[in-house]
């Protein structure tokens, strides 16, 4: 197990023998259910605001299939939703997760719009954590029960959670591949090369 410091807290990662990795994420929760926003030319959109390591607005997508062929239209729709959510009282939300039915054996499929109009090719670890928080709050997923989240490409994460007070601690498991190697240089004269203590 490896402890990784992130800007929102410590997460732990476990490498499994089959090459998959499990990440126990930061405490996650749903902040608001059924948040309505008005979108020009579209009308009312209803979704949940949740924290899973990033702030998400999660909304069911009923008009478009969540597949790669629709990525430009999905990006534009999610961007408009984000602008409406930000303008109507939720400036902290910087990710939009459109979700629908699973198409490849999963419980659900998602399209996640990230800051800068980028989209996540994976099912999104923080987005899956936010989704688990909503499912837990609605009592639609029991503690320890598995949830299979598909990405727009059909790749999958398996998520589950345990309760910790008013929060859940989500664990997300998926495939991992080595894509690079880095070297850290620790200078003798750098007083902070080993970090800082508090």
What residue spans do the PLM features occupy?
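Active-site proximal loop and beta-alpha junction motif in alpha/beta enzyme cores
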Residues: 1-198
């Amino acid at each position: 197990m490896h402890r990784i410091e992130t800007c929102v807290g410590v997460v732990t990662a476990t490498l499994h023998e089959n090459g998959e990795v499990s990440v126990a994420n930061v405490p996650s929760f749903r902040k608001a259910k059924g948040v309505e926003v008005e979108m020009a030319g579209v009308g009312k959109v209803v979704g949940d605001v949740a924290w899973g390591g990033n702030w998400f607005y999660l909304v069911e997508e009923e008009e478009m299939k969540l597949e790669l062929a629709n990525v430009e239209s999905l990006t534009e729709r999610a961007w408009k939703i984000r602008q409406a959510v930000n303008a109507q009282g939720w400036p902290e939300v910087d990710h939009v997760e459109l979700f629908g039915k699973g198409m490849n054996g999963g419980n659900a499929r998602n399209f996640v719009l990230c800051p800068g109009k980028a989209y996540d090719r994976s099912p999104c670890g923080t987005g899956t954590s936010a989704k688990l928080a909503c499912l837990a709050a609605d009592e639609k997923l029991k503690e320890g029960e598995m949830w299979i989240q598909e990405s727009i490409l059909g790749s999958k994460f398996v998520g589950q959670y345990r309760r910790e007070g008013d929060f859940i601690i989500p664990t997300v498991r998926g495939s991992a591949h080595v894509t690079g190697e880095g070297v850290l240089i620790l200078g003798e004269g750098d007083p902070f090369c080993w970090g800082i203590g508090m």
